[in-house]
From Swiss-Prot:
Known pathway: Cofactor biosynthesis; adenosylcobalamin biosynthesis
GO terms assigned for molecular function: ABC-type vitamin B12 transporter activity; catalytic activity
One Pfam family, short name: CbiA
Family listed: Belongs to the CobB/CobQ family. CobQ subfamily.
General function of this protein: Catalyzes amidations at positions B, D, E, and G on adenosylcobyrinic A,C-diamide. NH(2) groups are provided by glutamine, and one molecule of ATP is hydrogenolyzed for each amidation.
PANTHER family hit by this protein: COBYRIC ACID SYNTHASE, DETHIOBIOTIN SYNTHETASE
Coiled-coil region(s): none
Record keywords: Cobalamin biosynthesis, Glutamine amidotransferase
Entry protein name: Cobyric acid synthase
């Protein structure tokens, strides 16, 4: 039986591609279709560890969840993780292959395409349907040559395409018509229709525009998706800063620095979304405010982001915070920043050299070429030994007398991270440590919140995937889509 495939491309970044693919995956899964997600090439600092011991973009991990599948490297065979403004770490089938600048990567693309097609062959042999996500826009003229992320891939595997645009940004008709006009004749023929995302208001006021769009392009509008508030789904690129509804009176104030190369920022979503936590990301130029808890998130360029912290006054603010009895959490790169020194002799994250840390923990970190990648479970070294789950993605090895009391006892008996002797600092390499309801409740109590309600964000994420799927299923024209999708 042949495998169905459908590719969702967008007029811009953040148009709704990831969300629409997740919705389609959940809809098809609920209809009994064996479906898998796929993104040929992704560029993101947020990644997830896969069941086969690699890493992929978090959007594909979420889409796998929508399919009822464990994340696998075939779902995102090429992942680019920027290390500077001009250079990125190239990850092929979940493993670091090479670091390249943009020009060198352009020459490398044929090899990357080989990895993409290998994964595609495996997925289409195993599943009834594969829903594909493009990257950015297919109309980027300067990126058309050797494209493996959008139409270059779709043409190579003969995959039909729908294009999604975000009406909330404005200019939706110009985006859709302009994108189509910049495609080649064969690529235009590959486009089977449009989806308009994040509409709010009276749909009747949009009808004349939809009629014009269909007449102008000869392509059907397959659906107008409503603006959905309060979805708890992982953001892959931009840090989520939108106000969260349903908040109660805050029992704890938490802040985190939004440094330039912050990675896996979704680690902090449970704090941002918790009904009793006042959480804020603090950007460049903002004075670090007083808080009960400061969290230093992960970083893809720890030494550079540490320099940024100092330039923004965070080093002084953190030491003052601790003098006044505040609590401090460091996650992965944030953990490394808390030590006395960070060494990068091979220049894995920039120029070779060493940078003094914040000196909060008596440890030093050396970055090594072999990346640690694994899913973990265990218990926090806090009262009641609360359960935790998470994952590790890091280059560093941390050593020193500051590790006398580990922060996490993993299921294999290994102790990870550190809790300071004065009990003010909790540091771990484990991403996702706040996702488990027991771990989150315990860490909030450690930080000073009494009697917090236990919130299960994994259950909330599942419920929101269903809410998203319900909304998209009701909005799409399934009669027109029936030729493109099974079920």
């Amino acid at each position: 039986m042949p495998c169905y495939s459908l590719m969702v491309q967008g007029t811009t970044s953040d148009a709704g591609k990831s969300t629409l693919v997740a919705a389609l995956c959940r809809i098809l899964k609920r209809r009994g279709v064996r479906v898998a997600p796929f993104k040929p090439q992704n560029m993101a600092l947020n990644s997830a560890v896969t069941v086969d011991g690699g890493e992929i973009g978090r959007a594909q991990a979420l889409q796998a969840l929508a399919c009822g599948l464990a994340p696998h490297t075939d779902f995102n065979p090429v992942l680019l993780k920027p290390t500077t403004d001009k250079k990125a770490q190239v990850i092929i089938h979940g493993k670091v292959a090479i670091d390249l600048d943009a020009k060198a990567y352009h020459a490398y693309k044929p090899r990357a395409m080989g990895a993409v097609l290998e994964s595609w062959a495996r997925l289409t042999a195993e599943y009834e349907c594969v829903v594909v996500e493009g990257a950015g826009s297919p109309a980027e003229i300067n990126l058309r040559d050797r494209d493996i992320a959008n139409m270059g891939f779709a043409e190579a595997v003969d995959c039909p395409v729908i294009i999604v645009a975000d009406i909330d940004r404005g200019g939706v008709f110009a985006h859709l018509v302009g994108t189509l006009e910049l495609l080649s004749p064969s690529e235009k023929n590959r486009v089977k229709g449009f989806v308009i995302n994040r509409f709010r208001g009276d749909i009747g006021l949009l009808e004349s525009g939809l009629t014009w769009l269909e007449a102008r392009t000869g392509k059907p509008v397959l659906g107008v998706l409503p603006y959905l508030h309060g979805l708890m789904l992982d953001a892959e690129d931009a840090i989520a800063t939108a106000a969260v509804g349903g908040k109660k009176a805050a029992k704890l104030k938490v802040v985190a620095p939004a440094y330039p190369r912050v990675s896996n920022h979704n680690d902090l979503d449970p704090l941002r979304l918790h009904p009793e936590v006042d959480f804020r990301w603090i950007g460049p130029g903002e004075t670090p405010p007083a808080a009960d808890l400061i969290v230093l998130p992960g970083s893809k360029a720890v030494r550079a982001d540490l320099d940024w912290l100092r330039a923004q006054g965070w080093d002084k603010a953190i030491h003052k915070h601790l003098r006044y009895g505040g609590k401090l959490i460091g996650l992965c790169g944030g953990y490394q920043m808390l030590g006395r020194m960070i060494h990068d002799p091979q220049g894995l994250e920039g120029q070779p050299g060493s940078t003094p840390g914040l000196g909060v923990l008596a440890v030093e970190t050396t970055l090594e070429a072999e990346k640690q990648l694994r899913n973990v479970s265990g218990h926090l070294s806090l009262p009641g030994r609360p359960a935790m789950t998470g994952y590790e993605i890091h280059l560093g090895v941390t050593r020193g007398e500051g590790l006398a009391k580990g922060a996490v006892e993993l299921a294999d008996g290994v102790h990870d991270g550190a809790i300071s002797a004065d009990d003010q600092v909790f540091a771990t390499y484990c991403h996702g440590v706040l996702d488990h309801p027991e771990a989150l409740t315990a860490l909030l109590a450690w930080a000073g919140m009494s009697e917090s309600e236990q919130v299960d964000f994994a259950a909330r994420r599942e419920a929101d995937l269903d809410r998203l799927a319900d909304s998209v299923e009701a909005a799409l024209d399934w009669e027109k889509l029936s030729a493109l999708l099974p079920g």
